[in-house]
C-alpha cells in the first residue's frame, strides 16, 4: 500500500471529480456543478496557486482537501488576512478509509502553513479555520478535526500556526424588503454539489408552495447579494431558514411559517 499526496494542477484537475463525484460523473445536473467548480479551480490556480491536495492510494485518487485564503472569497464578511480556510476533507471510498489518507492531507496542509503556502505567496499563515459538517460518510468532520488538533470556537474550529486565533466579526442578518413574498437560495462554485443542491431546494419549495417565486444566486459572482443576506443559505419571505432540507418535516414547517409572516 502506497499513499501519495499531490498538489492540484491542470494535469490532475479531473481527479478532483473522480473523488468527489465518482458516483455521479455522468449525471447532467452534477456535471453543471462540476463545470462551475472546474472554472473556479482554474481561476484560483491562476490567481493563487493550488488550493486543493489529492491523496492517491496505489495510484488511484481517493481523497481530497480543499482550502484557500479567507480573504480570497469575495462573499466572506470581514475576512482575516493571512488566515487559511479549510473547506473540507473528503474520502468517499470505504476501502480507502482508515488508512491515513485524510490525515496525510491535513498534515501536509499544516506543514506548509507553517513553512509557507503557495496560495499565500509563499508566506506562512497565521492560523487555519474550518467549518465542519457531516456528510454521513466516515467519521464526522468535527470529530476528525478534533483528532487532528483543531479547537472549537463559536461557529468554527481553528488551529493556531504562527499567531493567536482571532474570531471573525460577522454581520447580523437584516431582513431585506425585496425578499418579501419570495425565496432566495445561495450556492457557490467551491463545491460541485452546491448548485445541484440549490436546485433541489427550489424543487422542494415549489412543492410546498407552487406560487412561491424562488431565485438562485451564485455567491461567488454576486458577493454583495450574499453579504447583505448574512450568507444564509436560504431566505424565505425575508426570513432565514435554519432547518436542513433532508429533515423534511421540520423544513416544510419552517418554510410554511415563514411564508405566512406578514
Regions found by a protein language model. Give the residues of each.
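Conserved acetyl-CoA-binding loop-helix of GNAT-fold acetyltransferases
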Residues: 91, 97-114
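Short amphipathic alpha-helix that is part of the acyltransferase structural core
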Residues: 1-57, 190-193, 197-203
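Non-catalytic, surface beta->alpha helical segment in thiol-disulfide oxidoreductase systems
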Residues: 238-262
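Conserved GNAT acetyl-CoA-binding A-motif
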Residues: 113-137
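Conserved acetyl-CoA binding element of GNAT-fold acetyltransferases
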Residues: 76-97
Amino acid at each position: 500500500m502506497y499513499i501519495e499526496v499531490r498538489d492540484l494542477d491542470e494535469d490532475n484537475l479531473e481527479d478532483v471529480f473522480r473523488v468527489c463525484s465518482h458516483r455521479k460523473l455522468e449525471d447532467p445536473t452534477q456535471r453543471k456543478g462540476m463545470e462551475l467548480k472546474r472554472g473556479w479551480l482554474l481561476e484560483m490556480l491562476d490567481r493563487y496557486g493550488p488550493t486543493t491536495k489529492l491523496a492517491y492510494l496505489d495510484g488511484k485518487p481517493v481523497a481530497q482537501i480543499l482550502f484557500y485564503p479567507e480573504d480570497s472569497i469575495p462573499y466572506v464578511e470581514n475576512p482575516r488576512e493571512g488566515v487559511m480556510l479549510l473547506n473540507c476533507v473528503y474520502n468517499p471510498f470505504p476501502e480507502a478509509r482508515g488508512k491515513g489518507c485524510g490525515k496525510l492531507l491535513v498534515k501536509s496542509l499544516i506543514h506548509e502553513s507553517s513553512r509557507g503556502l503557495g496560495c499565500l505567496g509563499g508566506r506562512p499563515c497565521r492560523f487555519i479555520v474550518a467549518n465542519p459538517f457531516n456528510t454521513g460518510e466516515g467519521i464526522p468532520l468535527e470529530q476528525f478535526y478534533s483528532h487532528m488538533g483543531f479547537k472549537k470556537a463559536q461557529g468554527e474550529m481553528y488551529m493556531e500556526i504562527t499567531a493567536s486565533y482571532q474570531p471573525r466579526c460577522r454581520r447580523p442578518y437584516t431582513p431585506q424588503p425585496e425578499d418579501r413574498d419570495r425565496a432566495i437560495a445561495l450556492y457557490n462554485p467551491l463545491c460541485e454539489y452546491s448548485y445541484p443542491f440549490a436546485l433541489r431546494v427550489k424543487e422542494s419549495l415549489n412543492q410546498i408552495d407552487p406560487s412561491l417565486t424562488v431565485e438562485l444566486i451564485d455567491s461567488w459572482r454576486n458577493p454583495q447579494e450574499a453579504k447583505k443576506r448574512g450568507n444564509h443559505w436560504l431566505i424565505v419571505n425575508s426570513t432565514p431558514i435554519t432547518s436542513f432540507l433532508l429533515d423534511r418535516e421540520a423544513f416544510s414547517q419552517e418554510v410554511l411559517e415563514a411564508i405566512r409572516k406578514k
